[in-house]
Regions:
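Auxiliary Fe-S-binding modules of radical SAM enzymes
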Residues: 1-21, 215-348
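Generic structural "secondary-structure junction" signal
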Residues: 10, 19, 28-29, 40-44, ...
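Short, cysteine/histidine-rich loop/knuckle motifs that typically chelate Zn2+
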Residues: 12, 26-29, 74-77, 81, ...
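Iron-sulfur (Fe-S) cluster-binding segments and ferredoxin-like electron-carrier domains
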Residues: 16-40, 84-94, 299-305, 324-331
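A generic "binding-loop/recognition-motif" signal
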Residues: 23, 75, 176
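Conserved Radical SAM active-site core
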Residues: 32-167, 336-343
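Conserved AdoMet/S-adenosylmethionine-binding subsite of the radical SAM
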Residues: 99-260, 265
Length: 348
């Protein structure tokens, strides 16, 4: 949007960066060229890898299937604890992989037998045009589109972006505005707005992830408040993943998150009536597995990303018939925990 002073205001995310000719926004990948904002990384990737869908993490979306994952560079948040900082803070585009058109990516996913493509490693909101074009090309081949995102998107852009997505994992980094301001240079409310939008105004399957950082966002008081908001606004059936922090980027002074902390968070969330609460980044079979909210039967056993016992039939518990929220196929996938880096040129 052109402003009276001659600057252009980018309307993609809540930062609403105001830039002069040649300047870039906070994300560094969107640049003013003439009278418009241009995505400078369109068609460029930081690399492609076939992963288990559970790694996104998505536990209730096509379990056991493979997903073709990729990202670009840059980010519209400034998280001091970023676990993918080498990608999200990249400024040298020549280090990105070879160019990849949406059609090439869709064809590669099809030839690799992937049921979905994930926009991940850095936030797809900042490369929305590219992500949308890839999602549309994939849809033509029956392949789903997954966004792994912090949910930091403006009201103007939210509907357009998510109407092209089939699933998402949204990163709820904390439940205080102070945390977002101090450690992410952002705000909490736009993320909460995205979560409510996904739940009440779309058919996008989504799950939520919170990285628990010792001493920053893991207090009982904050976890109780977050869980109460979650139950009231999103309901009991949206999965929530509590994952372990490791020291990285500009936050090297904090210890690793303990399994006990993750278990405590899981118990608090479940005490508020949430049905599907998981732990991640640690070896915890109980915390990673899905149990029936109706009878307590083990439905999907997970050991890291390996699936074990499976007691679902037509999306229902085999023991009591309780319908399990999610997107399930008649048979579970068999990709297992494999990680397969790929070069698109060798496939397409």
């Amino acid at each position: 949007m052109m402003l009276p002073d001659g600057r252009i205001e980018c309307r993609l995310c809540p930062r609403f960066c105001k830039v002069n000719e040649g300047q870039r926004g906070f994300c560094f990948v969107r640049q003013r060229l003439g009278d418009r904002m241009v995505l400078t990384t369109y068609g460029r990737s930081s690399g492609f890898c076939v992963d288990p869908i559970e790694k996104k993490p998505l536990n209730h979306f096509l379990p056991g299937t493979s997903v073709l994952s990729f990202g670009t560079a840059g980010c519209n948040l400034g998280c001091r604890f970023c676990q993918n900082w080498d990608i999200s803070k990249a400024r040298e585009w020549d280090k990105l992989a070879d160019a990849a058109s949406p059609e090439q990516i869709a064809l590669a996913a099809e030839r690799l037998g992937c049921r979905s493509v994930a926009f991940t490693y850095n936030d797809p909101v900042i490369f929305a045009e590219y992500a949308v074009d890839v999602a549309d090309a994939c849809r033509e081949r029956g392949i789903k589109a997954v966004a792994v995102t912090a949910g930091y998107i403006s009201d103007d852009a939210r509907a357009e972006f998510y109407q092209h997505m089939d699933a998402a994992n949204v990163d709820l980094k904390a439940f205080t505005d102070a945390f977002y301001h101090r450690l992410c240079f952002a705000q909490l409310q736009p993320v909460l707005d995205t979560l409510k939008y996904l739940r009440h105004e779309t058919n996008v399957w989504f799950e939520v992830t919170t990285l628990l950082i010792p001493g920053e966002n893991d207090s009982d008081a904050e976890l109780h408040r977050a869980s109460e908001w979650f139950a009231e606004n999103l309901g009991p059936n949206v999965p929530w993943h509590f994952t372990a922090f490791h020291p990285d980027f500009k936050m090297l002074d904090k210890p690793h998150t303990s399994t006990a902390t993750l278990t405590r968070a899981r118990e608090i969330a479940r005490s508020k009536g949430l049905h599907y609460v998981y732990t991640g980044n640690v070896h915890d079979r109980e915390g990673g597995s899905t149990c029936c909210p109706g009878c307590g039967e083990l439905l999907i056993e997970r050991d890291w990303y390996e699936l074990g016992e499976w007691n679902l039939e037509n999306s229902r518990c085999r023991s009591c018939g309780y319908e399990i929220a999610g997107v399930f196929e008649e048979r579970r996938g068999d990709w297992s925990a494999r990680r397969l880096p790929v070069r698109l040129a060798a496939i397409t």
